[in-house]
């Protein structure tokens, strides 16, 4: 496959996933409340980092929420945080906040009054174009987390006139096989896509699954363990290509 690098503007992206707001961790009511508040603090710091780093685009690659039963107060909090941003934000539903009937995204439209917020809703995949940034973002919404759902199925050919970013939420397989895990992402799909960057979610540890000339990364869960957590900053330029670095949430 021939990769052609046409001149394009530089681009700076924040990539996160697996925030799992309002996760059920068991314990007392006080422990549950403390965990909820910690999750909210993490999302605030993600937005703070996007503003401090002056990113052009924010990608949330699945499982922003831990389940579809979160209360309206959590939805209002998330909306308030998204409203702090003015750059485009793309949200991909994951397996915990999948796009089935009565999902979070049926209850609340995060783009209402916030046209910079975009939720991937098409089950067969959709492309969002941002001409001012010279970037296209593709993703496929998840309705069911099953082995037959392939997050990168129907990925179209890249547009060489723009940066091409695909989003996916699922389990990575280094080789083709009959998947025993749901929502499989195969190494050859990554390699053969030819896209500039694959913004992935589901693995809770930062993982580089780049294949050939295609950069593909899981940022890890920003609330995993007791450390402050990190996100990924992805810098695109025609001179240096795609550079990925961890940024702390402190």
Model feature map: region roles:
Residues 16, 217, 244:
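Residue-level signal for pocket-adjacent positions within structured domains
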Residues 25, 148-151, 242-246:
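Short, charged, solvent-exposed linker or helix-capping segments at domain edges/interfaces
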Residues 57, 67-229, 235:
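His/Asp/Glu-rich metal-coordinating catalytic cores
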């Amino acid at each position: 496959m021939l990769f052609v690098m046409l001149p394009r503007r530089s681009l700076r992206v924040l990539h996160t996933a697996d925030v799992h707001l309002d996760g059920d961790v068991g314990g007392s009511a006080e422990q549950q409340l403390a965990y909820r508040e910690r999750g909210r603090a993490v999302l605030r710091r993600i937005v703070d980092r996007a503003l401090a780093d002056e990113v052009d685009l924010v990608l949330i690659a699945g499982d922003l929420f831990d389940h579809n039963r979160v209360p309206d107060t959590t939805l209002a909090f998330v909306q308030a945080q998204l409203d702090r941003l003015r750059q485009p934000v793309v949200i991909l539903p994951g397996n915990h906040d999948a796009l089935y009937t009565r999902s979070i995204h049926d209850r609340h439209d995060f783009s209402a009054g916030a046209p910079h917020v975009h939720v991937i809703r098409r089950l067969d995949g959709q492309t969002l174009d941002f001409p001012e940034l010279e970037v296209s973002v593709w993703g496929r919404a998840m309705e069911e987390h099953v082995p037959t759902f392939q997050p990168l199925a129907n990925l179209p050919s890249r547009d060489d006139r723009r940066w091409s970013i695909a989003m996916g939420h699922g389990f990575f397989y280094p080789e083709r096989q009959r998947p025993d895990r749901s929502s499989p992402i195969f190494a050859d799909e990554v390699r053969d896509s030819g896209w500039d960057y694959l913004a992935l979610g589901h693995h809770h540890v930062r993982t580089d699954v780049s294949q050939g000339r295609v950069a593909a990364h899981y940022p890890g869960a920003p609330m995993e363990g007791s450390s402050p957590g990190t996100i990924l900053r992805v810098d695109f330029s025609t001179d240096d290509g795609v550079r990925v670095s961890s940024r702390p949430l402190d």
